[in-house]
Every structure is written in structure tokens, then in C-alpha cells.
């Protein structure tokens, strides 16, 4: 089992090096006008578009919501500008399913900012992103980039590498989601959402 994990790690590292050499082309996944290209939740009251900005805002019942891409991805990179606007922001980027994500904002369980850290159902936060407090700009626009190659995840925050993690419970193919966490009052904004396939 240990040999299998080491072998997987070496393969992922090799793929990663090749990926950086090729610089995958990022294409816009958000047109700034409407939610075309995304699966809009039924009775949507959470997601809106105005002046080129995608806003996630809690509803009165604090139900929460996920906005999924209408396309599925295997190995990919996603990059987006984001801003924490109001309330206790707890959001994130789901990676092919709703069991693995890159946290953005305040963790509901830890009650502190865990931006850039992976949240894995059953493992919670197996690692924590580094130097986020020094890098993150409160109440301003920031940029996050997430790379997912099989179960290998890497995160950059404002062009600074903050996290690497390999998951053994990843899903091979699926959509990418933006989360509005339930049981919180919050507003968060996204713009310039771009996705590239590996």
C-alpha cells in the first residue's frame, strides 16, 4: 500500500512538471452577464449577476446553495477573483463532487479563516494553507488558482503558492462548484472565472 502511494505521488509530480511546462489555456467560464454555463439551482435566490460580478448571498432560511458548472472536468485548473463582502463568509470551490473542496473564508467548524485549505469529508482539513493571513487582502479583491490532477491539489493565492495535498478519495470526473454554505449570513463576490483542461 505504501509503495502504491509513493508511486502515485511520483506520477502526479511528473504530470505536474509537464503541466507547468505546457501552461494550460484558461477559458472564461463566466460571461459577466448571466449564469449561462452553470446549473442554476431551482427557485434560485442565492446567485445573481450584476456589472460583471457573480454574487452569492444567503437567503432568509440560510439554506445554502451550490452553483455547478454545466460541464464536467477530469484534470483542470480554475482561477477566479473573489471578495468577501458581508457577514461570516464561508464558501469554497468543490472539486468534481460535494465531498472535496478548497475552503474559502471562515470554517464553520474551526471558526477561523481557512482560505486555500482542502476540506475533505471524513478527514476535515488534512493540511492547512500556509501564510494566508499575510497574503489575503480583507475587503478587497483577491485571486485564487486551484489545480486538480487526479487527487493532487495545489492552490495559489494572489500568485503565492499556499497549499499542496494528495487525496486518496477523489472523484475522477465531475463538475466544479461554487459554494454558499448553509447556516450563515454572508455575501461573497466572484469575477473573471476561468477554467482550463489539462
What annotation goes with each model-predicted range?
Residues 21-198:
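Carbohydrate-interacting regions of secretory-pathway proteins
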Residues 1-23:
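Bacterial Sec-dependent N-terminal signal peptides
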Amino acid at each position: 500500500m505504501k509503495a502504491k502511494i509513493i508511486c502515485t505521488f511520483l506520477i502526479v509530480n511528473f504530470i505536474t512538471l509537464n503541466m507547468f511546462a505546457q501552461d494550460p489555456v484558461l477559458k472564461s467560464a463566466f460571461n459577466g452577464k448571466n449564469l449561462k454555463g452553470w446549473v442554476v439551482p431551482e427557485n434560485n435566490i442565492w446567485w445573481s449577476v450584476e456589472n460583471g460580478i457573480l454574487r452569492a448571498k444567503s437567503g432568509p432560511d440560510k439554506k445554502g446553495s451550490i452553483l455547478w458548472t454545466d460541464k464536467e472536468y477530469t484534470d483542470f485548473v480554475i482561477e477566479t477573483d473573489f471578495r468577501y463582502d458581508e457577514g461570516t463568509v464561508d464558501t469554497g470551490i468543490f472539486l468534481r463532487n460535494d465531498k472535496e473542496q478548497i475552503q474559502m473564508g471562515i470554517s464553520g467548524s474551526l471558526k477561523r479563516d481557512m482560505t486555500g485549505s482542502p476540506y475533505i469529508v471524513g478527514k476535515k482539513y488534512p493540511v492547512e494553507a500556509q501564510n494566508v493571513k499575510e497574503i489575503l487582502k480583507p475587503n478587497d479583491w483577491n485571486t485564487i488558482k486551484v489545480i486538480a490532477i487526479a487527487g493532487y491539489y495545489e492552490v495559489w493565492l494572489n500568485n503565492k503558492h499556499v497549499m499542496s495535498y494528495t487525496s486518496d478519495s477523489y472523484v475522477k470526473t465531475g463538475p466544479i462548484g461554487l459554494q454558499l454554505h448553509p447556516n450563515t449570513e454572508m455575501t461573497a463576490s466572484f469575477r473573471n472565472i476561468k477554467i482550463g483542461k489539462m
